């Protein structure tokens, strides 16, 4: 079991670089292995055959469920309940309910695993993670310099954008490696890793990952320098900015802004049109929204299609490419308030960490993930949720046990 866990810790970031969607499968397998490990350890404490094992399994599940309810009744459970309720009035209730089940089973599994017994032989697992990250970096440069040598083995063509998911995964996973190096006294190596990943992201096609990782670096420094006021500063900034974003998106003139500042960035220009369109849709159902995971089912008339520089763009291709707008569009103001309550809660938990480096790296990773979600990806995409859970589990079971922290 230990060998398989070590192999997966190496494989997830490295394979994820060239096949980003694989994270959904590899992280799920990783979580299931840890979950089964927890069950086996619990059952080993019990004597007897099948009945004892059965009783142990049921007892473990009951304990995890009770702990889950006790810890989340004020925030997570309320948000989950509202997501479920919104499925009932969604544009396609069955599809929304199916997505809801997938998402929250994965989240529950991740929560359960993250509260299990820490990894054994953590030095080996830490080395596997760092080696996996370095392999991911190497694979990126191979693909970048050879115009997709590995990708073209399986696909007819290659575009640098095909590595965007891998870059996003690398950007958030690197913070785990950075805190591992810092906690081992290897500050120079941690700085070198940050600079290397930052350079990689700067030449990649993933602007969201580059912005998230670079701002994460600034956050790391600020969290170390102004610890007494940093929590209030970051909490007020994030929550206020998130509340104002739908208002700002409605007020902007995407065509004027695109022609002035984004003439050579069609992808960024398209996002401005998407955000403006979504903000206008939000005003039609501001309180309840359109229902969980309903973005891709909202009908668009031909008159609403965007004509820009001879190209015809869809104003809402699958999702809003912004987590705050997607939450508000699908779950309404009620969902947005509950979501921001979760954001505040997690920031508060990070602030309770006593280790300066661990606290700063946790802030950086959280902001990195948040910023990527504000520019790219569907908030309910399984591979993206899996990426966040993957980092959470590593932080709690691989990094935290070797650092004295609170919460």
Swiss-Prot record:
One cellular component GO annotation, for this chain's record? membrane
The root-end lineage is:
Bacteria, Pseudomonadati, Pseudomonadota, Alphaproteobacteria, Rickettsiales
Protein name, entry field:
Putative polysaccharide ligase RF_0568
The regions listed as transmembrane in this protein's record are 15-35, 71-91, 100-120, 129-149, 166-186, 203-223, 229-249, 272-292, 324-344, 379-399
Q: Which UniProt keywords apply?
A: Membrane, Transmembrane, Transmembrane helix
As for family, the record states: Belongs to the O-antigen ligase family.
Q: What is its main location?
A: membrane
Bilayer topology term: Multi-pass membrane protein
Compartments in which it is found: Membrane
Q: Which organism is it from?
A: Rickettsia felis (strain ATCC VR-1525 / URRWXCal2)
Determine if NAD is one of this entry's keywords: no
Query: Could you confirm whether the keyword Transmembrane appears in this record?
Result: yes
In terms of superkingdom, the source organism counts as Bacteria
